[in-house]
Amino acid sequence: MNLSDITHPNQLHGLSNRQLEDIARQIREKHLQTIAASGGHLGPGLGVVELTIALYQTLDLDRDKVIWDVGHQAYPHKMLTGRYHRFHTLRQKDGIAGYLKRCESNFDHFGAGHASTSISAGLGMALARDAKGEDYKVVSIIGDGALTGGMALEAINHAGHLPHTNLMVVLNDNEMSISPNVGAISRYLNKVRLSDPVQFLSDNLEEQFKHLPFFGESLTPEMERVKEGMKRLAMPKVGAVIEELGFKYFGPIDGHNLEELISTFKQAHKAGGPVFVHVATVKGKGYELAEKDQVGYHAQSPFNLATGKAIPSNKPKPPSYSKVFAHTLTTLAQNDPKIIGITAAMATGTGLDKLHAKLPKQYIDVGIAEQHAVTLSAGLACEGMRPVVAIYSTFLQRAYDQVLHDVCIQNLPVFFCLDRAGIVGADGPTHQGLYDIAYLRCIPNLTIMAPKDEAELQRMVVTGINHTDGPIAMRYPRGSGVGVPLMEEGWEPVSIGKGEILRNGDDVLLVGYGTMVHQSLQVAEILKEHGIEATVVNARFVKPLDTELIVPLAQRIGKVVTLEEGCLMGGFGSAVAEALLDHDVVVPIKRFGVPDKLVDHAKPDESKADLGLTSPQIAEEIRQLFFNTPQPSAVS
């Protein structure tokens, strides 16, 4: 059977192992061709091809529900659930998403972008099923590091307390998240993977007993008891912890052996109650380069399939904000042993792998455990260390209470470095960094800043390290800087709560924040072509806002525009509007940012165009609003 003919996963039923292996081969080919052409997550999906096929071969997916953790594992799932012919549109505007979305397919039972959610969601569905008196299977597939997340462990704790609730948890154990897994749980699972000799010995004994003359076959039932005894003997090294938590444990099994997978899943479906199936896989399976470099090939930009090398862009790009941050922090840390970099399983993405390589004692990776990362940093700060929490904006959401309760209420000097702030592009709504300004600026004691470019980022890293009066956060975007000259060392801090004027004009005041400062300058140049002169301010800080600079300018010029790459509701523009009203300055103000809607996956420039946030669009709206039409009301 051709993969292209499969429109429903139930079509896998009745296929021979040889046919299923051929489907697996076709999935890998399509997966590799698509990611090589357009980019995306490569290694995770390649590792679960056989797991997906075997599981779906044992389920009735018109009834049964499968919940995937960390949706980038689910590319094979997408191909087997009617999206093969659209798979080439993966992560592109108006194409299929790189993660799971309930609105995209009836087979996507729960949306997933962040990690460690599948067991909680699956247990909720299983309890709902039982409450309604229905009868279908619920399977939660967790892996790619997600079992290191606290929520997953909370869900296991709850599920194990419900012996009559049928729920299957499948662990895709590839020893990785994005970087290698860390922590005691990971170390324990690695021991489990290494316990195969016990399984080999018991299987070998059974085979030898079968060949004994006269009564070999009759000993098979006894052999089963011997095998069970051996399993119990080995339990301290295998599934003892899982079984003590109330689950029936199966595994570890070879995640690339279809026959073994199908047999185990069939047994597990019959077990009843909470069941845990431990599947050992290889991240990047089937593509040698990805198997050898599982971190580098976790996700890829477009690349040459033969060589594995990224396809070079037409013109060289400036270094990324993440790279500049990593260099600056590492340089400062070399002269200050109190600086400790903390990541939650995102060392490569945040650049902290550079700090780890040079100063391993000044680096901590807590795994997918954002809440722990923040409170750990609070403890470090209590003892005089300078903790730097490098974390994606979207993931800090997961530790909001810890930021408020453990850091800000105690006014501890923790430095939060929020990577991927703003519009992130192809990862879509689960990963957009649009909300941090709004959810952080309402917290007392917290200072919040954003650099206009990569050179100012270097200065703000120094500012954050030097700021010992309380917590401070810096937000910065994904991708390349704007191309300004950089210093290797000797950076001067910026003054807390002070912005700067970059351009003077008497007709309209443009106040930009972070990435939108350079765009404000572009808008000013376009307006100049229409005879409109703008003052441009780089705010630098949303909290404390430089009211000594902004309020008099607004009062004098009389027309105010704010520009931010974040949500308008509660964002930077709201802060400026509040400040003007607090100072009894009532002037027309227009806020540009992201409205109250989700931003889907697309290239950042495509998303900005859809949102009316390109420089020509902003300039035209300003011209129409302030200079070609009657004056608007005070606040929009």
Curated annotation (Swiss-Prot):
Which pathway? Answer: Metabolic intermediate biosynthesis; 1-deoxy-D-xylulose 5-phosphate biosynthesis; 1-deoxy-D-xylulose 5-phosphate from D-glyceraldehyde 3-phosphate and pyruvate: step 1/1
Q: Per the record, what are the reactions this protein catalyses?
A: D-glyceraldehyde 3-phosphate + pyruvate + H(+) = 1-deoxy-D-xylulose 5-phosphate + CO2
UniProt-listed Pfam families: DXP_synthase_N, Transket_pyr, Transketolase_C
Q: Which PROSITE patterns match?
A: TRANSKETOLASE_1, TRANSKETOLASE_2
**Residues noted as binding Mg(2+) in the record, renumbered to the chain:** D144, N174
- Gene Ontology biological-process annotations: 1-deoxy-D-xylulose 5-phosphate biosynthetic process; isopentenyl diphosphate biosynthetic process, methylerythritol 4-phosphate pathway; terpenoid biosynthetic process; thiamine biosynthetic process
Q: Which GO terms describe its cellular component?
A: cytosol
Which cysteine-cysteine pairs are annotated as disulfide bonds in the entry? none
The record's keywords, sorted A to Z, are: Isoprene biosynthesis, Magnesium, Metal-binding, Thiamine biosynthesis, Thiamine pyrophosphate, Transferase
Top-tier EC class: transferase
Q: What does it do?
A: Catalyzes the acyloin condensation reaction between C atoms 2 and 3 of pyruvate and glyceraldehyde 3-phosphate to yield 1-deoxy-D-xylulose-5-phosphate (DXP).
Q: Which PANTHER family match?
A: 1-D-DEOXYXYLULOSE 5-PHOSPHATE SYNTHASE-RELATED, 1-DEOXY-D-XYLULOSE-5-PHOSPHATE SYNTHASE, CHLOROPLASTIC
| Protein family membership | Belongs to the transketolase family. DXPS subfamily.
Q: What is this protein called?
A: 1-deoxy-D-xylulose-5-phosphate synthase
This protein's encoding gene: dxs
